[in-house]
Amino acid sequence: MSKTWFVAGTDTGVGKTAISCALMAAASATGLRTAAIKPVAAGCDDNGYNDDALCLMEAMTEDLEYSQVNPVALEAAIAPHIAANLAGKTLQASRLVGLCRGVMLSQANFIVIEGAGGWRVPINPRETLADVAVQLQVGVILVVGMRLGCINHALLTAEAIRRDGLQLAAWVANQPGPRMACHEENLETLRQMLPAPMLGDVPYLPDWDATEAANHLDVHFLTE
């Protein structure tokens, strides 16, 4: 039976893609087949490719087309709903859900759905990316960017996930830059206050590698 996880972040730039790739590397090391989808990405090169989506493709074991991994690729590196408006496109949660289900029907048995920005990123005036996770009814893995303000951001996000009726399955402490002051104290507070197990504390890796990052994660209960 396949397992699907929605990877959310406490903010933009906290390392959702890096951790998504590390999760897949850890899962594939146990023999699982992995796949990922980033249904909406804002910020593409001249060929219409998004760097995060390309990283996901490199990390997964399944051979999926780019259009499956990143079906909505928006040129401008700004909030998705604004980028969509500039591109003359309309984003709808129901359509994004259908695109995600397409990947969920693949041969992979460990699937990652990566969000964009934080939990409440709008996709239109009425819906956010959280609505995609809610309609899919999948567990959420929260990436906490270990920097000043992370405790407040993490607790607010966990509360929002709970109020949306979803399970915060686990969280990952990720260092997107040099180690923050009082790192261990912040980490211990998060351990005590977040209502989910911590999968690991991933250090800042200047020469980032998914396999190396995976060594800092314990994903056994996600893959059982």
Where are these predicted regions, by residue range?
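Glycine-rich phosphate-binding P-loop
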Residues: 6-23
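N-terminal phosphate/diphosphate-binding loop that engages ATP/GTP or pyrophosphate donors
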Residues: 18-90, 94, 99-103
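Switch II (G3) loop of P-loop NTPases
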Residues: 96-125
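Short internal beta-strands
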Residues: 38, 141-144, 169-174
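C-terminal lobe/tail of nucleotide-utilizing enzymes
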Residues: 158-224
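Inter-motif core of Ras-like GTPase G domains
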Residues: 124-147
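Extreme N-terminal starter segment of soluble prokaryotic enzymes
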Residues: 1-6, 32-33
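Structural motif
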Residues: 6, 110-114, 141, 172
